[in-house]
Amino acid sequence: MAEDDIKIVMFCCNWCSYGGADTAGTARMQYPTNIRVIRVMCSGRIEPQFVFKAFREGADGVLVTGCHHGDCHYDAGNYKLDRRMRLIYKLADELGIGRERIHHDWISASEGEKFAETVKMMVDRIRALGPSPIKKQLAEA
C-alpha cells in the first residue's frame, strides 16, 4: 500500500494530545501527513460509533489519544476511554476490522516527539496491513 493512500483518523483531546500535535508542528518535527486530526474536548467523550464511522468513511486506521492518567482536565475522562477502548477493540475484531487497526495512547501537550513517533508507528502498521476491509467492501459495492 502506497503511503499516500493511507488514511488515518486521529481523535485528540483538546487539553493534552492536541497540544502535543501543536508542539510537534511548532518544533517542525517530521511525521507522516496521512492523519486527519479531530479535536475533541475530552478523550472520555469518544464513543465507539465515532471510531467505526471513521472506518465507514474510508479510514484505514484510527488513533485515539488523550491525557495521561491523573492529568485529565475533566478528572476521569481518560479512565472512561480506557473502558471504552476495551469494547472498541472487541467490536473491531467481531466486525472483521481487526483491533490492530486501532491504537490508543496518552500524549501530553509537551510530548511533541511522542506524538510524531505515534503517528509514524501507526502509518507503518497500516502500511503493513493494507487497506481496511471496510474500504475494500465499499469499493466492491
From Swiss-Prot:
Gene giving rise to this polypeptide: mvhD
Function: Part of a complex that provides reducing equivalents for heterodisulfide reductase. MvhD may form the contact site to heterodisulfide reductase.
Protein family: Belongs to the MvhD/VhuD family.
Presence of keyword DNA repair: no
Xref: InterPro entries: MvhD/FlpD (IPR003813)
One annotated GO molecular function: 2 iron, 2 sulfur cluster binding
Originating species: Methanothermobacter marburgensis (strain ATCC BAA-927 / DSM 2133 / JCM 14651 / NBRC 100331 / OCM 82 / Marburg)
Cofactor: binding comment: Binds 1 [2Fe-2S] cluster.
One Pfam family it belongs to: FlpD
EC number(s) given by UniProt: 1.12.99.-
Cofactor(s) required for function per UniProt: [2Fe-2S] cluster
Keyword Repeat among record annotations: no
Keywords: 2Fe-2S, Electron transport, Iron, Iron-sulfur, Metal-binding, Oxidoreductase, Transport
Subunit organization: The F420-non-reducing hydrogenase is composed of three subunits; MvhA, MvhD and MvhG. It forms a complex with the heterodisulfide reductase (hdr).
Protein name: F420-non-reducing hydrogenase iron-sulfur subunit D
